[in-house]
Amino acid sequence: MEPQLVAVSVLVSALICYFFFRPYFHRYGKNLPPSPFFRLPIIGHMHMLGPLLHQSFHNLSHRYGPLFSLNFGSVLCVVASTPHFAKQLLQTNELAFNCRIESTAVKKLTYESSLAFAPYGDYWRFIKKLSMNELLGSRSINNFQHLRAQETHQLLRLLSNRARAFEAVNITEELLKLTNNVISIMMVGEAEEARDVVRDVTEIFGEFNVSDFIWLFKKMDLQGFGKRIEDLFQRFDTLVERIISKREQTRKDRRRNGKKGEQGSGDGIRDFLDILLDCTEDENSEIKIQRVHIKALIMDFFTAGTDTTAISTEWALVELVKKPSVLQKVREEIDNVVGKDRLVEESDCPNLPYLQAILKETFRLHPPVPMVTRRCVAECTVENYVIPEDSLLFVNVWSIGRNPKFWDNPLEFRPERFLKLEGDSSGVVDVRGSHFQLLPFGSGRRMCPGVSLAMQEVPALLGAIIQCFDFHVVGPKGEILKGDDIVINVDERPGLTAPRAHNLVCVPVDRTSGGGPLKIIEC
């Protein structure tokens, strides 16, 4: 028996060593990007990470350089923190990184069929083309402009009423409500209360689930993610199933009554849900759209169109409250271009360069999605470093925006850095993925398709708010902060996006005395 026990012990030890050190064997001899020498069995370098991954990666880049690698369990992860390597990975080697990272939460909550996370291929190309033509193209964006204006006016009325009563407003929640209503009307023709689900989904998408990286824990729910994911799935699926079923019944009733013409929001504009339901009935469609595809796309646009837009507007307001001189300067620009008798509109924004610069500076310091994530689908070489297939890529947009090698005084909120000076093109930095020092929407084929909508909606919303109101910030104990006491917490909360850790609560102050632009919307 004793020799048999020895043999079994040796076999078990060999298996354990093989699985623990398999990453070393598998990649032996390859010139991988620099990596911390010490890593623990099973978890690899996970012990070096905090709850905010982009900040942890930023700190590690100071020690290991602009391109380094980490092991999350047995999974190799590559982190890029400079415009040069961002361009090498997202443009030069774009085809090798044309897929997104799909976690357990992403797969479940997007029905494995979303535009944002679907593998690059025929389905993804078809859905992107459909989305750009029918929802995110210039024609559709312009068609829904009046609806965005209505939601902005509704928020301004709320702020005006609270200003008269000298009552506090949770700006964070009101911005989420507005952006959720906008994308909901564009998607399904009516405002839906989905913002709580959306915030929870974006949070869990960005949280670190060890079961996604360590084979030993694949079937274990050590952090309770499984239950949270299932609860979120049921909440969202119930909501979206009700929406789809209601629309299907409406379509049946119209056909039964012999009615034809536009459906959707009821104002002559077709929403995206109607178009998707048409696709399910089209036998000649190049890709057969099914119910799960519709649910996945609604999830896509609810999460992408609600949280990111609200976050960017809130961060801009925070920075303007902290920097009164910048706030005064942009108000002077608005007064000179728009006047004092009407509200800022989307059509005004191209003529408001300082307002646009404020938005870009906000994206630099507070990108709504702090990292561009990809999965390597084919081994490639970057600057003599080998990136193996199935490696995960993180381009740290947050870190790039705070790098003193590319930005003077990077922690200072200074919109002037984005203004075009006469005879100098240094201020001409676009946000559409061609300038790799500023990538709030990513770059290449997989960049955010909603960039045009965001660049129309956010500056007009921000401009209208600051045109009409000042704000007294409310402290954590309910006190109004004044003078040197105005210290706004800028900590971030973990998640796929980078919202503030604490809601922005303010008492609005009407700077128009109920006249001017607010009088037009009958405040």
Swiss-Prot record:
Summary of the function given for this chain in its UniProt record: Catalyzes the formation of licodione and 2-hydroxynaringenin from (2S)-liquiritigenin and (2S)-naringenin, respectively. Can also convert eriodictyol to luteolin.
Pathway recorded for this protein: Secondary metabolite biosynthesis; flavonoid biosynthesis
PANTHER family from the UniProt entry: STEROID 21-HYDROXYLASE-RELATED
Induction (UniProt): By fungal elicitor.
Chain segments annotated as transmembrane: 66-86
SUPFAM superfamilies linked to this entry: Cytochrome P450
Reaction(s) catalysed (UniProt annotation): a flavanone + reduced [NADPH--hemoprotein reductase] + O2 = a 2-hydroxyflavanone + oxidized [NADPH--hemoprotein reductase] + H2O + H(+); (2S)-liquiritigenin + reduced [NADPH--hemoprotein reductase] + O2 = licodione + oxidized [NADPH--hemoprotein reductase] + H2O + 2 H(+); (2S)-naringenin + reduced [NADPH--hemoprotein reductase] + O2 = (2S)-2-hydroxynaringenin + oxidized [NADPH--hemoprotein reductase] + H2O + H(+)
CC per GO annotation: membrane
Enzyme class, spelled out: oxidoreductase
Protein name: (2S)-flavanone 2-hydroxylase
Keywords of the record: Flavonoid biosynthesis, Heme, Iron, Membrane, Metal-binding, Monooxygenase, Oxidoreductase, Transmembrane, Transmembrane helix
EC number(s) given by UniProt: 1.14.14.162
Binding site for heme: C448
Cofactor(s) demanded: heme
GO biological process annotation, one example: flavonoid biosynthetic process
Organism (species): Glycyrrhiza echinata
